[in-house]
From Swiss-Prot:
Glycosylated sites: 51, 169
This protein's name: Putative phosphatidate phosphatase
Bias (Low complexity) ranges: 35-53
Subunit structure: Homodimer. This complex seems not to be involved in substrate recognition, it may confer only structural or functional stability.
Tissue distribution: Expressed in embryonic gut in a pattern that guides germ cells towards mesoderm (initially in hindgut and then on lower side of gut). During extended germ band stage, expressed in ectoderm as a medial band throughout the trunk.
Keyword Transit peptide: no
Renumbered residue ranges of the record's region Disordered: 1-53
């Protein structure tokens, strides 16, 4: 019996060491298991985070592309609107200028001056015919080439001086049309020359209306017309002395049809009105725009020379027997008053600085808020 007990005890002892029960050396470490599980969960989380991050980046890139596309479309739309606005403004200016100048062409081609009578013994109508001292090409040079050239030179110099002062960073010099940045001098020349041309056309139209409405005879009327009365008599016959002659025809030997028409257009003087408008306006322009620290007298000398050009032109019309002195005076007043009105009330030469831009600027300026908008001062 005791032996049996020993055997059973041995079996029991052996059963405790069977492979079905792991020994302490073979038991896994709980820390390693926890670490492994933690690493597995971390890998899963990192994978999920990477997938989410990639998804967010893709969405952001798509949003950026959409935003860039919308911005480009918006920019293109604003650019097209800006170009259209500039074209409409320029086209409207040209149309208005043509409308104002068209009646002058009609007067020249189709206009008929008022038929005024005369006295055969009127000494003011018996002067000989002379060619003009100031020819037409000289008149056009005085009234067109000189003002345009002076305005161009002054505006270019002003623009260069501004560029030097601003070191190329001046925002007021940015004008964009058809994706081309227009310089400031070009815009200013367009404004100044356009307004000058508008004023010159109106001054000439005012003069022509008076010419064709009054029909005053020129001092060389008798020499050019060589009038013959209905009964065949002339001014050399005594029966016509002291008579006011209304019914007559012009023999006009050696006179062209244009000369026979021009002999009735004495009042007011067109040469005087045109040159005085051009030179007075140019003097006012220099007063407002020309600033040279070298010598203040240079500006006033140029102004004096320009006025003297107009003064000489007006005097030559009397000495050439093209006009009576009152015709020249009236023409000079029309031109001078027109220049004063245009310079002070039509142009911006003497206006206070204005913060409203004349032309549309860049796309950034179009999108800028009122507080951030770039303003331009015109002077």
């Amino acid at each position: 019996m005791p032996a049996v007990k020993i055997i059973m005890s041995t079996e029991t002892s052996a059963s405790e060491t069977t492979p079905l029960r792991r020994s302490e050396n073979e038991t896994p470490d709980h820390k390693e298991l926890a670490q492994s599980n933690s690493n597995s969960r971390q890998t899963t989380v990192n994978s999920n985070n990477n997938n989410y991050s990639n998804s967010v980046q893709v969405r952001l890139q798509e949003q950026d592309r959409d935003s860039d596309s919308e911005q480009q479309q918006h920019t293109a739309t604003i650019t097209m609107d800006t170009n259209k606005r500039i074209l409409c403004r320029v086209g409207l200016d040209v149309l208005i200028l043509l409308c104002a100048g068209f009646p002058i062409l009609l007067f020249f081609l189709l206009g008929e001056p008022y038929k005024r009578g005369f006295f055969c013994d009127d000494e003011s109508l018996k002067h000989p015919f002379h060619d003009s001292t100031v020819r037409n090409w000289m008149l056009y040079f005085i009234g067109a080439v000189i003002p345009v050239g002076v305005i161009f030179i002054v505006e270019v110099i002003i623009s260069q001086n501004k560029a030097k002062q601003d070191n190329g960073n001046a925002t007021s010099r940015r004008y964009v049309f058809m994706n081309y940045e227009l310089p400031d001098w070009m815009i200013e020349c367009y404004k100044k020359i356009g307004i000058y041309a508008f004023g010159a056309v109106l001054s000439q139209l005012t003069t022509d209306i008076a010419k064709y409405s009054i029909g005053r005879l020129r001092p060389h009327f008798i020499a050019v017309c060589q009038p013959q009365m209905a009964d065949g008599s002339t001014c050399d016959d005594a029966i016509n002395a002291g008579k006011y002659i209304q019914e007559f025809t012009c023999k006009g030997v050696g006179s062209s049809a244009r000369m026979l028409k021009e002999m009735r257009l004495s009042f007011p003087s067109g040469h005087s009105s045109f040159t005085f408008f051009a030179m007075v306006y140019l003097a006012l322009y220099l007063q407002a725009r020309m600033t040279w620290r070298g010598s203040k007298l240079l500006r006033h000398l140029l102004q004096f020379l320009f006025i003297m050009v107009a003064w000489y032109t007006a005097l030559s019309r009397v000495s050439d027997y093209k006009h009576h002195w009152s015709d020249v005076l009236a023409g000079s007043l029309i031109g001078s008053i027109s220049a004063l009105v245009v310079a002070n009330y039509v142009s911006d030469l003497f206006q206070k600085p204005n913060t409203k831009p004349y032309l549309a600027r860049t796309v950034q300026d179009m999108n800028a808020s009122p507080a951030q908008a770039i303003t331009i001062t015109t002077n």
